[in-house]
């Protein structure tokens, strides 16, 4: 059995520098406690703000760790070009020495789809 943690990315009322330090500390603590992975979600129009690039943030969080894996929980696939996702995943997998878990989904935040110009009603079709 393996265990992972979903890290909080919503920054409502929190200084972003402080949130970054907390995420780094939580990742280090998770690794020290024996957790297998940490996960980040993807929200672009979250109330109060959010950290919006889970793969980029995950790459930074893995620096300074040796064993723990990073995963997306989940990346809203219809909002991204599949080649870009594949390339970013390939690079992240390489620099992390194979410690990446890709979680994909159709997404659900209507405001995110509006911001990206992707019709919310077509998200399942775009995902396939």
Range-by-range predicted roles:
Residues 1-65, 69:
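N-terminal beta1-alpha1-beta2 module of alpha/beta enzyme domains
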Residues 41, 73, 103-105:
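Structural motif
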Residues 64, 69, 73, 107-110, ...:
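A generic, residue-level signal for flexible/boundary positions that often mark functional hotspots
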Residues 72-80:
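Active-site nucleophile and cofactor-binding loops and adjacent substrate-binding regions
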């Amino acid at each position: 059995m393996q265990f992972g943690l979903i890290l909080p990315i919503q920054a409502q009322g929190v200084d972003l520098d402080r949130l970054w330090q907390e995420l780094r500390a939580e990742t280090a603590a998770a690794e020290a406690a024996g957790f297998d992975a940490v996960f980040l979600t993807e929200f672009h129009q979250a109330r109060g703000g959010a950290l919006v690039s889970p793969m980029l943030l995950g790459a930074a969080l893995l620096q300074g760790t040796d064993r723990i894996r990073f995963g997306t929980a989940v990346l809203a696939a219809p909002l991204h070009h599949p080649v870009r996702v594949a390339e970013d995943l390939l690079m992240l997998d390489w620099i992390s020495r194979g410690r990446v878990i890709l979680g994909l989904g159709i997404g659900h935040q209507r405001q995110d789809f509006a911001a990206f110009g992707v019709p919310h009603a077509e998200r399942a079709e775009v995902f396939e």
